[in-house]
């Protein structure tokens, strides 16, 4: 945001009553998303934090697309990194939902209220994380999330296209090869 935008967004009454907190929360989310910021979701994984801010101030709880969009992507066997079928476009409105669905289940429903703090800690403690190819990071996320949850979350992540083999170049903030193989899926 430019300095002139601060007057529009920063007065507390406007942030809360007019739902203007999404933009600042989205930008601050970029500071916290490191462990879940992989190619194809740079502009959506940070919205876990935006959705949380909306929840905390009592506003609507998600800006994400309806889950019927997810069902369509699954029906068409699209991998998570390329739900739109265009390697230059991120499906931000549905991508943000995966992180929020996990929060709703584990935190809001009280299943495991330390799920995200523990998951982020485990991801942060992997000092090699940023050097791991993006497809491997995706599968590591599945493994770590399942470990922290003490549940096999493979079916959940399969619905979200994590368990769909893919080998393509994604053009988002640079060019990155995104590879998830059947062998990687089987290992997870």
Positions of PLM-derived features:
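Generic structural signal of hydrophobic/aromatic residues within well-ordered alpha-helices
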Residues: 71, 76, 80, 119, ...
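Beta/coil-rich, acidic/histidine-enriched accessory regions frequently appended to metallopeptidases
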Residues: 133-188
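Gly/Ser/Thr/Ala-enriched C-terminal appendages of enzymes
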Residues: 91, 95, 99-142, 146, ...
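Catalytic cores of extracellular degradative/oxidative enzymes
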Residues: 1-108, 113-119
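Residue-level detector of solvent-exposed, low-hydrophobicity positions
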Residues: 8, 107, 123, 167-169, ...
């Amino acid at each position: 945001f430019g300095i002139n935008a601060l007057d529009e967004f920063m007065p507390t009454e406007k942030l809360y009553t007019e739902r203007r907190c999404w933009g600042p929360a989205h930008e601050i989310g970029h500071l916290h998303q490191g462990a879940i910021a992989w190619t194809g979701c740079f502009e959506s994984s940070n919205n876990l934090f935006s959705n949380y801010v909306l929840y905390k101030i009592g506003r609507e709880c998600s800006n994400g697309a309806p889950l019927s969009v997810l069902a369509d992507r699954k029906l068409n066997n699209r991998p998570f990194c390329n739900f739109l079928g265009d390697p230059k476009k991120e499906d931000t409105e549905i991508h943000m939902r995966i992180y929020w669905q996990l929060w709703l289940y584990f935190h809001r429903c009280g299943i495991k209220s330390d799920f995200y703090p523990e998951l982020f800690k485990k991801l942060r403690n992997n000092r090699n994380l940023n050097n791991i190819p993006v497809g491997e990071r995706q599968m590591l996320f599945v493994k770590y999330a399942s470990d922290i949850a003490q549940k096999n979350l493979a079916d959940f992540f399969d619905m979200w296209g994590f368990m769909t083999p893919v080998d393509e170049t994604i053009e988002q903030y640079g060019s990155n090869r995104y590879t998830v193989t059947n062998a990687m899926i089987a290992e997870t």
